[in-house]
């Protein structure tokens, strides 16, 4: 938490800390597949990250928004979907990388709770916070976690995963772009005036690679068709239907010359997954311009990470994404 910028407020400090841990765990899991000799060390680090996320200090931001602790109320009906799903996703990666059974009971409880709450909801979706809309990327983390759980537990909860994907394909696609919408009402109805955001769409594509690769490839092609910007600053636009030369979005980051920093970063994941080499290289060139990597003690990292650590964690996860 102390590594997160103070200026974004306690809620977003908590969110960014959660996403930093979650994305770093994803990167370590990916590297365990790419470089099996690193698996033991990676497992230890994923374990440490899970313990960080379990700490009250980190989950406090979610508890304050919901008025109750997310882990002490798993038998209840309030959502907590973002915190719970990221934690469950991290545990699933720990298990899939060969981790022991220390988190088995918690994993069972988290996924059982998510599945029950989803099935009891109005639209198979849950809000991240009270009195707010459904953020589709947050929901997809839950579906990824349940999908991984099903792989580890003889298909348990796979029916919920498949039902959600069917509804996504039939009810939640934007009419103009064909991409998954960014926001839904509690009833599962897309908002007519809400934008389809490049940052959300790129993240949706990334999560879909872990659930339905055919659907993910289709969405990735649509993302490139509607949001890809060529030229010196090659990347994903935050808005496909109008220009934004200078702006700021708490999720996308500073939007400069139309480019979405987080959208471009998340798109690296899909480009890596689908071996879209030319596009991936161009994304990474833009990332280098924006982030400026430096060498220190035989390690390389983005200088921009001194301000936004979450960005470096995201980029490492995206650059190592594997089928």
Where are these regions (language model features)?
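Structural helix-adjacent loops and short alpha-helical linkers that scaffold large soluble proteins
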Residues: 31-47, 94-109, 150-162, 208-225, ...
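Alpha-helical junction/boundary sensor with strong preference for TPR arrays
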Residues: 35, 57, 98, 118-121, ...
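Well-ordered alpha-helical segments within folded domains of soluble proteins
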Residues: 16-32, 77-95, 134-150, 190-211, ...
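Extended ligand-binding groove/face enriched in aromatic
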Residues: 20-22, 27-140, 181, 320
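CBM-like carbohydrate-recognition segments
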Residues: 2-17, 59-64, 75, 216-323
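A conserved position within tetratricopeptide repeats
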Residues: 1-5, 11, 25, 32, ...
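Extended ligand-binding clefts on enzyme/binding-domain cores
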Residues: 82, 121-124, 132-262
């Amino acid at each position: 938490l102390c590594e997160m910028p103070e200026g974004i407020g306690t809620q977003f400090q908590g969110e960014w800390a959660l996403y930093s841990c979650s994305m770093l765990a994803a990167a370590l899991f990916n590297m365990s597949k790419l470089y099996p000799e690193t698996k033991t060390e990676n497992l230890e680090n994923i374990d440490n990250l899970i313990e960080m996320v379990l700490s009250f200090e980190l989950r406090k931001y979610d508890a304050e928004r919901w008025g109750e602790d997310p882990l002490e109320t798993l038998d209840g009906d309030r959502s907590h979907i973002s915190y719970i799903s990221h934690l469950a996703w991290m545990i699933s990666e720990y298990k899939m990388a060969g981790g022991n059974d220390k988190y088995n009971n918690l994993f069972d409880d988290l996924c059982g709770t998510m599945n029950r709450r989803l099935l009891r909801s109005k639209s198979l979706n849950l809000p991240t916070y009270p009195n707010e809309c459904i953020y589709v990327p947050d929901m997809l983390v839950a579906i990824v976690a349940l999908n991984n759980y099903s792989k580890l537990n003889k298909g348990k909860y796979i029916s919920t995963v498949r039902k959600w994907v069917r509804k996504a394909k039939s009810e939640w696609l934007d009419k103009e772009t064909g991409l998954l919408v960014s926001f839904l009402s509690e009833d599962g109805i897309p908002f007519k005036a809400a934008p389809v955001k490049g940052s959300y769409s790129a993240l949706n594509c990334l999560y879909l690679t872990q659930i339905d690769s055919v659907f993910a490839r289709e969405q990735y092609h649509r993302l490139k068709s509607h949001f890809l910007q060529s030229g010196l600053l090659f990347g994903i636009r935050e808005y496909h239907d109008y220009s934004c030369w200078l702006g700021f979005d708490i999720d996308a980051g500073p939007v400069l010359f139309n480019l979405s920093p987080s959208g471009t970063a998340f798109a690296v994941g899909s480009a890596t997954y689908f071996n879209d080499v030319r596009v991936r290289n161009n994304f990474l060139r833009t990332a280098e311009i924006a982030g400026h990597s430096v060498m220190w003690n035989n390690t390389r990292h983005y200088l921009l990470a001194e301000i936004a650590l979450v960005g470096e964690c995201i980029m490492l996860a995206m650059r190592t994404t594997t089928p």
